[in-house]
């Protein structure tokens, strides 16, 4: 079935975040993040009303953040959403400061800051104050996953990046990484930036590495990462991926011969 990706409107806030919370609640990494950011839960009517009102207020003030909805063209139902910041001009250090987590306090706030500080720091090191597109959130209702809605959402943002000539940056999860990879995103090499959340902070058995990913727009070669042209880094990623694929094929052949 065809999916439409459109700018979200004010009446879409609640259904967009219905898809968001449903998707994150059923994803292993997403559920951990929800527990850290919203430790009191996300299902109560009181929370959802406050969240919707807070989102509406943010929409009235944000100058860079855009929300997209993915619509089932047969039913008109909103089944997914994407939230991205579009930074079309350079930003100062003051403009790039991490917002405070004002709704949390004490140990809960400290825990959330330990998680978000690492993500914020990595993004700062990779992209800095340069113009780029940042995919802040991406979700498809679990009932509609695996049918092309996620691909449609990502493609819409890829098209945006190509149109305005800006790279796209995001923090993926282990379950979403392949969706982005198929659209041309590649992981940032660990020597440039790496985020590993400690198990003690997440409440997991093992540390968790976050896939940091970048997609270059068509024809962009002058954006730099740590003083290097992103085009050069991109070529390295492509070569590394090619070598990995060759190694995987060799291992498969060896296994078949055994």
List PLM regions with ranges.
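A short beta-loop-alpha structural element at the N-terminal edge
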Residues: 4-30
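Conserved GNAT-fold acetyl-CoA-binding loop/helix
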Residues: 28-54
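Conserved acyl-donor/pantetheine-binding loop and adjacent beta-alpha core of acyl/acetyltransferases
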Residues: 31-32, 46, 57-64, 75-145, ...
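Hydrophobic beta-strand residues of extracellular immunoglobulin-like
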Residues: 66-69
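Conserved acyl-CoA
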Residues: 123-129, 152-168
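Conserved hydrophobic beta-strand within the GNAT/NAT acetyltransferase core sheet
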Residues: 135, 168-172
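Conserved acetyl-CoA-binding loop-helix of GNAT-fold acetyltransferases
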Residues: 137-140, 146-159
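Conserved active-site alpha-helix within GNAT-family acetyltransferase domains
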Residues: 151, 163-165, 174-197
């Amino acid at each position: 079935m065809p999916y439409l990706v459109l700018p979200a409107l004010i009446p879409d806030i609640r259904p967009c975040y219905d898809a968001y919370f449903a998707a994150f609640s059923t994803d292993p990494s997403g559920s951990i993040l929800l527990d850290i950011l919203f430790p009191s839960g996300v299902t109560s009517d009181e929370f959802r009303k406050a969240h919707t009102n807070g989102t509406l207020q943010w929409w009235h003030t944000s100058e860079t953040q855009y929300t997209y909805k993915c619509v089932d063209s047969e039913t008109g139902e909103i089944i997914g959403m994407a939230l991205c910041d579009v930074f079309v001009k350079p930003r100062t250090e003051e403009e790039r400061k991490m917002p405070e987590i004002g709704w949390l306090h004490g140990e809960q706030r400290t825990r959330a800051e330990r998680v978000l500080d690492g993500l914020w720091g990595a993004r700062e090191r990779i992209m800095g104050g340069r113009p780029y597109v940042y995919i802040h959130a991406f979700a498809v209702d679990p009932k509609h996953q695996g049918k092309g809605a996620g691909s449609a959402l990502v493609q819409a943002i890829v098209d945006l990046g190509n149109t305005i000539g800006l790279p796209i940056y995001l923090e993926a999860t282990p379950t979403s990484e392949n969706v982005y990879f198929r659209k041309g995103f590649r992981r940032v090499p660990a020597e440039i930036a790496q985020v590993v959340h400690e198990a003690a902070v997440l409440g997991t058995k093992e540390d968790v590495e976050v896939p940091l990913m970048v997609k270059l727009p068509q024809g962009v070669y002058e954006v730099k990462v740590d003083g290097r042209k992103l085009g050069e880094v991109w070529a390295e990623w492509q070569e590394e991926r090619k070598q990995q694929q060759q190694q995987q094929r060799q291992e498969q052949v060896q296994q078949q011969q055994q």
